[in-house]
Amino acid sequence: MKLWGGRFRKAENQLMEEFNKSFGYDCVLYKKDIEGSVAHVHMQVKCGLLTEEEGKSITEGLKGILEDVENGKLVLDGEYEDIHSFTEINLIQRIGDVGKKLHTARSRNDQVAVDMRLYAKEKANDLVGLISEFKATIKDVADKNPVMMPGYTHLQRAQVVTFKHHLMAYYSMFDRDEKRIKNAIEILDESPLGCGALAGTTHDIDRSITCEQLGFKKVVDNFMDGVSDRDYLLELMSDFSIIMMHLSRLSEELILWSSQEFGFVEIDDLYTTGSSIMPQKKNPDGAELIRGKTGRVYGNLFGLFTVMKGIPLAYNKDMQEDKEGFFDSVHTLEMCIQIMDRMIATLKVNEDKMKQAVKNGFLNATEVADYLVKNNVAFRDAHGIVGSIVIYCEDNKKAIEDLTLEELHKFSDAFKEDIYDFIDYESILNKGIKKNLK
């Protein structure tokens, strides 16, 4: 049974039928489809399209379908065109012809639009919760590890920072991500139910009833936009892509830092794997998979952009292609955030390795220049002097702080005994606004 027909002289081609079906993936919308239908029935009764008795029968039938799906008595499988067909066909089989009245004053166009908004809103709120928990994990691990480490530019050692400050940079990123998703929720929080196929309905319905029951902030302003808008999915998927980019950057650092070449951190065994041939290997597969799956989420976003770019108003079947990519991106992001949260929570920080890397990289060179500036040397001259000192240190395999005052005087008479305290790494982190690094 289909929800359409009558005007066709030929039955649908079997290949076309398979090509047209979406039930294999839009079945995940079953809760939202039933939730939206229950609200629609409530509105139908209020507006005189159904009697109280009819409304009660349909509502109980819908809730029975939901209960049976939840407890496994009714399986989301079969030759249904889509989730809407599944719901309506099973309803009619349960309660008889009165179930055929469910679709009065509704189209699958506004039905799927409300299903997707409800689903997107719920999943977006779930992600806000996951990000909030992840931020708490980041802050906890950062606060417990205020140890010094090299800060990098161009992946070259640059200046001394702290692991805490480095990790809290990601806190700032994910804090912005959380705000972006909350903003997207605010924008999508409009009900399209009642828009019909594209032009509303001749029935004197009240869209505010379903809007309020479904928890939306307001109804959409335009019927045609209401059924053809997928901006909210594009916005959320853009936000997802930015989050994945941030997760990928953090993954890359964990991969580098956990290598023997760095040794700054150790990823817990729970989130690593081994090699089938090399017994010694401990591979950061959790982080690598997050890095790899970032491209997958990007691809889903650009796939939907491409779907939507040439569609005239209003609904077109192309829009069926909005679902798989969105569902996949949501699932991927949920998994990646949770895996990263656990990796960070169980991360072991190697303080000694980080300190050793600081001392081997001339990371106090900028502070040597600052010292000269404080002693009336122009910064550009100071910059050149310190560059020459670094070359001298490299040639003689020394750190700047290990040079004698006599050696330093070869480059400038501005150096005094207090230079050593000034460029001590712990001392550096207590000067000026660098105190904010700790």
Swiss-Prot record:
Pathway: Amino-acid biosynthesis; L-arginine biosynthesis; L-arginine from L-ornithine and carbamoyl phosphate: step 3/3. GO terms for cellular component: cytosol. It catalyses: 2-(N(omega)-L-arginino)succinate = fumarate + L-arginine. SUPFAM superfamilies: L-aspartase-like. GO terms for biological process: arginine biosynthetic process via ornithine; L-arginine biosynthetic process. Its main location: cytoplasm. It is an enzyme of class 4 (lyase). Pfam families: ASL_C2, Lyase_1. Transmembrane segments: none annotated. InterPro entries: Arg_succ_lyase_C (IPR029419), Argininosuccinate_lyase (IPR009049), Fumarase/histidase_N (IPR024083), Fumarate_lyase_CS (IPR020557), Fumarate_lyase_fam (IPR000362), Fumarate_lyase_N (IPR022761), L-Aspartase-like (IPR008948). It comes from the Bacteria. It is found in: Cytoplasm. One of its GO terms (molecular function) is argininosuccinate lyase activity. Keywords: Amino-acid biosynthesis, Arginine biosynthesis, Cytoplasm, Lyase. Its EC number is 4.3.2.1. PANTHER family: ARGININOSUCCINATE LYASE. Belongs to the lyase 1 family. Argininosuccinate lyase subfamily. This is Argininosuccinate lyase.
